[in-house]
Amino acid sequence: MKAAVVEQFKKPLQVKEVEKPKISYGEVLVRIKACGVCHTDLHAAHGDWPVKPKLPLIPGHEGVGVIEEVGPGVTHLKVGDRVGIPWLYSACGHCDYCLSGQETLCERQQNAGYSVDGGYAEYCRAAADYVVKIPDNLSFEEAAPIFCAGVTTYKALKVTGAKPGEWVAIYGIGGLGHVAVQYAKAMGLNVVAVDLGDEKLELAKQLGADLVVNPKHDDAAQWIKEKVGGVHATVVTAVSKAAFESAYKSIRRGGACVLVGLPPEEIPIPIFDTVLNGVKIIGSIVGTRKDLQEALQFAAEGKVKTIVEVQPLENINDVFDRMLKGQINGRVVLKVD
């Protein structure tokens, strides 16, 4: 089968023929139709996270397609089902985290496109219990980004605790941020979009953002405080230390700062202000299978629409270059089939 493979860190991916995966008990073989491109894939290819993936590696954790083969022990899925393979490739199923609905914190989890091969290929093996079905009225290209960008931001907004009518600031209007704006509006929240790109802020306005601010032109935190008295919550998708610092300063008393993006730096937090103002700082990592089902339902009902640019698998290195330069609006989806 054809696949895009990381053979050396920080080197171009090789699009080549590799062996088609074989499945075993509890697994399914998915014929990949499309796969979204996430910033995490870039980290996997560069090997710049503390825990590096083993090479060679096929990246991709937004792979969607059709089940072509069902392994022994699988009774809830059949050949022909439309499914996606999320970042949470599998978890142990019996630790405290798995049993309490926090499976994304499982210490024995496997991750698609990082610890196991992912969706930058014509075929992908998957743990049957962790694939999620795609609603019939969503195309593969529309559905793919929901499997990471969508569920990640939807879950992050849930954990803010923000209520309808309250204000939330979305820092970074890229692959995650553009769907975060839509989920926030669908949840009844007022939205401030923050980004360094005017074209991305224009997209945010088209998607329903109530206010937009560019930190190149204004101190975003001060501007937000002047306009709305501070936000009840922030969701930071930008891979930028400055964005996290600004997001913290933009929160009103009792608010929540939810961290999603993963910049390499450490961020100093003023303990006195955090305690005195009752500010909550929360890390949020993707979402559970249930979160993913809910996120897909918003898209199926037309309340969230991913903005996608379709590219052939062979263009992956060009896509990575553009991603590094911040030149992508919405999400790039690789057409694999």
Curated annotation (Swiss-Prot):
Keywords: Metal-binding, NAD, Oxidoreductase, Zinc. One of its GO terms (molecular function) is alcohol dehydrogenase (NAD+) activity. Pfam families: ADH_N, ADH_zinc_N. Disulfide bonds: none annotated. Zn(2+) 2 binds at C92, C95, C98, C106. InterPro entries: ADH-like_C, ADH-like_N, ADH_Zn_CS, GroES-like_sf, NAD(P)-bd_dom_sf, PKS_ER. PROSITE patterns: ADH_ZINC. It catalyses: a primary alcohol + NAD(+) = an aldehyde + NADH + H(+); a secondary alcohol + NAD(+) = a ketone + NADH + H(+). Substrate inhibition is not observed with any alcohols, and the enzyme-NADH dissociation is not considered to be a rate-limiting step. Its EC number is 1.1.1.1. Its cofactor is Zn(2+). Binds 2 Zn(2+) ions per subunit. It is an enzyme of class 1 (oxidoreductase). Thermostable. Zn(2+) 1 binds at C38, H61, C148. NAD(+) binds at G172, I173, G174, G175, L176, G177, D195, K200, V260, G261, L262, R331. It comes from the Bacteria. Belongs to the zinc-containing alcohol dehydrogenase family. PANTHER family: ALCOHOL DEHYDROGENASE 1-RELATED, VACUOLAR PROTEIN SORTING-ASSOCIATED PROTEIN 11. NAD(+)-dependent alcohol dehydrogenase. This is Alcohol dehydrogenase.
